[in-house]
Amino acid sequence: MSDITIIAIALAAVLMFVFPLMTMSDRTDDVAQLTVETATTEFVDTARSTGKITKANYDKFIETITSTGNTYNVDMEVQVKDDNLGKKVSQATADKIGENVYYSVYTSQIEEALNGKNAAYFCKEGDIVSASVKNTNQTISQQLKNFFYTVTGNDSYTIAAEHAGVVTANGK
């Protein structure tokens, strides 16, 4: 065989096997991205509308995102509205008395409440609930891109979602 034939066979092998593999792995990442975005939005919206984060909802959320076959770092934050009623203003309406200050409660504190006797973290109207999810493992798509292109590093993530909103109901 001539050199051109060997090159043609090698190129055909790449086009027939590697390119479809890369395309399918990218498609898998797209499906995982959509799943994570949907689950994150549903989790935060449920917490916003009910005013509480329950262990059952949190476990369902974690189960849904891990069903994609990846590992994730989930960060939750609740910015608790702290009404400062000690500082008065001249208007006598309930909405304008004092200043509102927010303090943050993070993932570890929320998980402690979920594992406690109530199995829930209760919010009140006006609190802000947010969740952020990022994959911690390298997907097949990332590995192939690293092999062929050397584009991404080991610390990068391709699947991520964030959602936040204001709580509209008291949890207790």
Q: What kind of feature is each model-predicted range?
A:
Residues 129-172:
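Glycine-rich, aromatic-bearing surface loops/beta-hairpins
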Residues 1-3, 75-77, 165-172:
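Low-complexity, flexible helical/coil segments
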Residues 2-63:
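Alpha-helical assembly-interface signal, strongest on the long, hydrophobic N-terminal helix that forms
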Residues 124-128:
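Extracytoplasmic
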Residues 46-122:
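Short amphipathic secondary-structure patches
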Residues 8-13, 32, 39, 47, ...:
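A sequence-composition feature that detects small, non-aromatic residues
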Residues 2-3, 90, 106, 139:
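Serine/threonine-rich low-complexity intrinsically disordered regions
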Residues 5, 9, 82-84, 139:
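Residues in flexible loops and secondary-structure boundaries
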